[in-house]
Structure formats: C-alpha cells, structure tokens
Swiss-Prot record:
Protein name as annotated: ATP synthase subunit a
Classification via HAMAP family: ATP_synth_a_bact
Protein topology in the membrane: Multi-pass membrane protein
Coiled-coil parts of chain: none
Subcellular location: Cell membrane
Spans through the membrane: 49-69, 109-129, 137-157, 173-193, 203-223, 232-252, 253-273
Keywords: ATP synthesis, Cell membrane, CF(0), Hydrogen ion transport, Ion transport, Membrane, Transmembrane, Transmembrane helix, Transport
GO molecular function terms attached to this record: proton-transporting ATP synthase activity, rotational mechanism
Disulphide-bridged cysteine pairs: none
Functional summary from the UniProt entry: Key component of the proton channel; it plays a direct role in the translocation of protons across the membrane.
Higher taxonomy: Bacteria, Bacillati, Actinomycetota, Actinomycetes, Propionibacteriales
Quaternary organization: F-type ATPases have 2 components, CF(1) - the catalytic core - and CF(0) - the membrane proton channel. CF(1) has five subunits: alpha(3), beta(3), gamma(1), delta(1), epsilon(1). CF(0) has three main subunits: a(1), b(2) and c(9-12). The alpha and beta chains form an alternating ring which encloses part of the gamma chain. CF(1) is attached to CF(0) by a central stalk formed by the gamma and epsilon chains, while a peripheral stalk is formed by the delta and b chains.
GO CC term, one of those recorded: proton-transporting ATP synthase complex
Pfam family, one: ATP-synt_A
Length: 276
C-alpha cells in the first residue's frame, strides 16, 4: 500500500477511519484473483506488489554488487570501495566475530540475507513504493524457514543427526531426572520456536512502524481538511510526528535487518559448535 493509494476518504459525517491490518492486504496486480484465509491472514492467488518487490530487490542487489566486483583493482573505484565495505561489514561483524573459525562458508548466505532484508525494509521509505515487503508475515516466514533449514543442516552435517539433536536438546553438565523436563523445553526452544520468533520479530516491527506512519499521515490530513481550524495545531503536530517516525523507521529498518542476520549467525554458531 502506498500513501497516495491508501488515503482514507470517508463519507461526509462518518468521521475518520483509522488504518488497520486490512490496509496491508494488497490486491493482486490486474485484479480479478481469488483470495483465501489461513492463520488469520488473507492470501491472494496472483502476483501482488510485495512479490514484485522481492524480485526487484534481487535484481537491484545483483546489478549493484556485480557492477562493484566486475572491474576489481588494487586501487578500488568508488563503487568497488563501497561494495567491499559492505561485504567486510557482514563478513567481519556478523560472520567471523559470531561464528568463529568455520565462518567463511556461511558468509555468502549472511551477506545476501542482510542486504536483501535491508532493501526490502527500505522500500517502506522509498517514494512511489512506500511498502515494506516484510510487513506481510508470509514473506518473513519464508526467510525464517530457509534460515531454519540452513543452520540445522549445518549442525547435522558436522555432528550427525543424533549428535546434533543431543547438542540442541541436552544441556551440558546436567544429569538426572530433571533432564526429562529440560529436554522437551530445549527441543521446543531450539528446534521449533526459533523460526517463529525470528519471523515475528521482523514482521511485527515492519508492520507496526508502517502502520504508525499511515496513522500520523492520514490523521493529520483529516484533522487539517475535515475538522475546524482550532484543531489545526493538532494536525500539524501529527505531520511533525510523521516526519519524526519516518526517520526512526529508517533506523529500525537497518536494525531489524542486522538483528535478523545476527540471530542467524548465532544459531549457526550454536549448530556447528563443539559438543558440550
């Protein structure tokens, strides 16, 4: 949903209609497609704007980093310098420092994941797009499942299935009957719950931030255009809050991409760590 397309026009005397989850249910491009409900979410059988944004993000990132790496030189160009700086940031702070000596083979995934999430988050602040892709929960669950497969596969590859299951479910240094209580809890926490919390954290922040932006923008417009002049200062304040939240949202877009990849690195580190 863009701000231009989501301006709430209410019938005269009906009052202001605040934005809500329904504003994130975008129709299929071209219209005329069926929808169905699952897990409290509306799903469209067709191509939607967030789907196109995923493709656009992949194309933009490929073109940028291909151009940055195409003519590598000892004295880097500005584009190469920026590309290497981006790569070094993920490699060192999210790969080497978190995973340790086995980090190198996971850097391509962490690097791609970080900038893919960051750009899709940033779409919420880019004019004429103005919709963070991961404010739709289904998009985030796809990334979470991919991450779950990768760090579990890494652990099984190193320790074997039984050894990895023991590593994830049996706390080190604990013996006796209490294990009957701890093992199911560890299994739930480390195997089942992680992808859910990983997805919900990113989704909730992108959803809530965008909802606040819409609320301040449309609320301010309604106060200034539909209410008496004595409420004008409130409308102006709402728009000032919109500007402030917009800048805060840019910071959150970066932080949520960083946190998502940081947790991925931590999960991988735990999966490939030596046994207790």
């Amino acid at each position: 949903m863009t701000f231009a397309a989501s301006v709430v026009r209410t019938a005269e005397g009906d009052g202001f209609t605040p934005p809500g989850p329904h504003d994130f249910d975008l129709p299929a491009i071209g219209g005329g497609h069926d929808t169905f409900e699952m897990f409290g979410q509306s799903f469209v059988l067709g191509v939607t704007k967030p789907m196109l944004q995923l493709v656009l993000a992949a194309i933009v990132l490929f073109v940028f980093f291909f151009a940055a790496a195409r003519k590598r030189a000892m004295v880097p160009s500005r584009l190469q310098f920026v590309g290497e700086g981006f790569y070094g940031f993920v490699r060192n702070s999210l790969g080497r420092d978190i995973i340790g000596h086995d980090f190198a083979k996971f850097v391509p995934y962490l690097f791609t994941l970080f900038f893919f999430i960051l750009l899709n988050n940033a779409f919420g602040s880019i004019p004429f797009i103005e919709f963070p892709t991961f404010s739709r929960s289904g998009m985030v669950y796809g990334l979470a499942v991919l991450s779950w497969v990768i760090y579990n596969a890494a652990g099984i590859s190193k320790h074997g299935f039984v050894g990895y299951l023991k590593l994830q479910t049996v706390p080190g240094g604990i013996r006796g009957p209490i294990l009957a209580l701890l093992i199911p809890l560890e299994f739930m926490s480390n195997i089942l719950v992680r992808p859910v919390t990983l997805a919900l954290r990113l989704f909730a922040n992108m959803f809530a931030g965008h909802l606040l932006l819409i609320l301040f923008a449309l609320g301010g417009e309604y106060i200034l255009t539909e209410m008496s002049v004595q409420y004008a200062p409130v409308g102006i304040l709402a728009w000032l809050m919109f500007v402030a939240v917009a800048f805060l949202e840019m910071l959150i877009q970066f932080l949520q991409a960083y946190v998502f990849v940081l947790l991925n690195a931590m999960y991988i580190s735990g999966a490939v760590a030596d046994e207790h």
